[in-house]
Amino acid sequence: MAENQYYGTGRRKSSSARVFVKAGSGNIVINQRSLDQYFGRETARMVVRQPLELVDMVGKLDLYITVKGGGISGQAGAIRHGITRALMEYDETLRADLRKAGFVTRDARQVERKKVGLRKARRRPQFSKR
């Protein structure tokens, strides 16, 4: 008998995450590794857990996640967005709380492109008066 499984896609910067949620004991598997193995930084782990802590589902759901692209921060943000969407599919009544916390909205900020004549996106070459 197939268990009910809920899905959410999350994106942030150049990262995209696919999140599968089902009832369980609180296991979080990211790219075949545990949360602690995958993210060395405590802040990244905290970002991933935020939506679950908000709706008190920390030990009640198992998460299977595949994430690709970007760096640590972008991947953590993409996973958070994906978990939020999967939780909304799991229980629509959670949407209001997740929206209030700002997890439903996709963070649209992207890296600004480098411009010709500048060193970076906005950093100008040093100006010399004489």
From Swiss-Prot:
Keywords: Ribonucleoprotein, Ribosomal protein. One of its GO terms (biological process) is translation. The keyword Ribosomal protein applies. It holds the Pfam family Ribosomal_S9. Gene3D superfamilies: 3.30.230.10. GO terms for cellular component: cytosolic small ribosomal subunit. One of its GO terms (molecular function) is structural constituent of ribosome. Belongs to the universal ribosomal protein uS9 family. This is Small ribosomal subunit protein uS9. It comes from Sodalis glossinidius (strain morsitans). The lineage of its organism: Bacteria, Pseudomonadati, Pseudomonadota, Gammaproteobacteria, Enterobacterales.
